[in-house]
């Protein structure tokens, strides 16, 4: 086997780290897809089973073709997983993360039946905002860029032309006055704060201007002037003040994607006034005097703010005027920042394509009510996500990636490439059908067998009620079981999956949360209850995805409990058996012995330690703290604050680790009778 190392390809800026050479179906898939892109195919499908290394195939394609790439995932959890993997494959290149930066988002809305107007309310995650700005900067500056994102990329983010026109290029020796630098920074939506130096802030001390770039995760820029000439540019650590690097040139990017040059704002003010006059005349003619008064009051306040400050609350609702677009034209999005020859990968495309199609309709119905009742001008309707056909028109050469492609991919794929054989030699699980009327008793027996072998079990039910009842029943019979449902937040979900892998419990019961992207090699049995109840949760695609959860284990098996075999079941079983036969044949032909996946738990959710008992507590907390009542109280407060800070920054693993230490410390207090 070839030793791990970096691989480079001709005319490609990427340095691909290969922990192992492509194996199984990977070499053929990489060659076929790369050739398809080179031949100009617009749409291709990678039909890759669970555990076949689809991300590795994508990384090899990107490196070979040497083009920037956008990888779309259906949710933040899978996007984070892909981002971590891509960073491992491209540690020397720009791998960026572009997801929604809202921790909490309540859009403005009006409920006519109750005459209730709900103001927009949101909480922005600073770290994700920085990563979004870093993503667009990388696209504008370098070719070796891979962006991992979600459906968030079809929402408007400001015109790339305006964004690029606002950058401030600084070179040592250039002549520029201190006043001009400060004016440019304010226009770019940077804030002056000499006391609290954080992202998007600048501070001034005589002829020295410190700028903390909005897209920078940790380093700031020190600009030193002498007699209106740039004397030096230095990157420094804002915490220690230590200079890291002297630079001949630096580009400061705007503090927000929504920056607009002053002349554009002034032009927009005039077109907003014109639209306001027309809309007021229409409302008055229709006898809607309250709506007309409301609209005039709200819009004139916004115009005043735009005139004085250059921006206002809810400025995105005037995006059509600011971009100079015609009514009905789509807004500029991240897709507009991509070069024409970029690659697109849509992961779990059977889910993601549906999301891309659904975003526009929900947004439209809410805004139409706001316009109808005088809360917004009609141009607010053009601040929206892209429609599916608009997204299609902007798509670059695209690869759909899924184990179960849906109708859209089947219609659009010019080339379908199968990746069925796994590099590990693992084959798809054996699928059995057993009677549904004895399903619970039979399942209990199977669970005891698996638990004795230190293996895990996933059980999927049709309803919440049944999942709860089954969990109670199994628990009463001595089974270590947990229940995963939609009310559980992301932190706890990650924790439950971690505990399942660590063997804290043996059985996980769920409804539809046990399908795409769950990577648990310890699971050797998947049980699907009531498999013959046709519907969304028991469709062919859902069944194949659920069966696939047992495909990472050497002893993988799936049991479908049903009193009759439905069409969906038949197709799912036939497809699984077809793949299994192909995998076994490949192993026989090449003398491959299947080996189980041995994956460290920290890789699933990096940074979480094992459950915190006394040993873990004593290693995490100084010994003197454990013997002093006041010190323990202080430590509890510190851990609570740390946990909340990590949760706010979406650092769920660190938040969970802090929570474990906190719980262990509280238990210690109770056990020792301290405090």
Swiss-Prot record:
Q: Which cysteines are disulphide-bonded? A: none
Q: Entry's CDD domains?
A: DEXHc_UvrB, SF2_C_UvrB
Localization of this protein: Cytoplasm
What is the residue range of the motif Beta-hairpin?
101-124
Under the heading SUPFAM superfamilies, the entry gives:
C-terminal UvrC-binding domain of UvrB, P-loop containing nucleoside triphosphate hydrolases
One GO CC term, this protein: excinuclease repair complex
Q: PROSITE patterns from the xrefs?
A: HELICASE_ATP_BIND_1 (PS51192), HELICASE_CTER (PS51194), UVR (PS50151)
Domain named Helicase C-terminal is located at: 439-605
Keyword match DNA repair: yes
Domain comment as written in the entry: The beta-hairpin motif is involved in DNA binding.
Q: What's this protein's name? A: UvrABC system protein B
- Keyword terms of this UniProt record: ATP-binding, Cytoplasm, DNA damage, DNA excision, DNA repair, Excision nuclease, Nucleotide-binding, SOS response
According to the entry, every stretch annotated as the Helicase ATP-binding domain falls at: 35-422
**Native source organism of the sequence:** Bordetella parapertussis (strain 12822 / ATCC BAA-587 / NCTC 13253)
What does the annotation say about its assembly with partners? Forms a heterotetramer with UvrA during the search for lesions. Interacts with UvrC in an incision complex.
The UniProt annotation places ATP binding at 48-55
Is ATP-binding tagged as a keyword? yes
The record's GO molecular-function terms, alphabetically, read: ATP binding; ATP hydrolysis activity; DNA binding; excinuclease ABC activity
Name the job this protein performs.
Answer: The UvrABC repair system catalyzes the recognition and processing of DNA lesions. A damage recognition complex composed of 2 UvrA and 2 UvrB subunits scans DNA for abnormalities. Upon binding of the UvrA(2)B(2) complex to a putative damaged site, the DNA wraps around one UvrB monomer. DNA wrap is dependent on ATP binding by UvrB and probably causes local melting of the DNA helix, facilitating insertion of UvrB beta-hairpin between the DNA strands. Then UvrB probes one DNA strand for the presence of a lesion.
The Gene Ontology biological process terms listed for this entry are: nucleotide-excision repair; SOS response
Q: Which residues form the UVR domain?
A: 633-668
Q: Which family does it belong to?
A: Belongs to the UvrB family.
Matches recorded under InterPro entries? Helicase/UvrB_N, Helicase_ATP-bd, Helicase_C-like, P-loop_NTPase, UVR_dom, UVR_dom_sf, UvrB, UvrB_inter
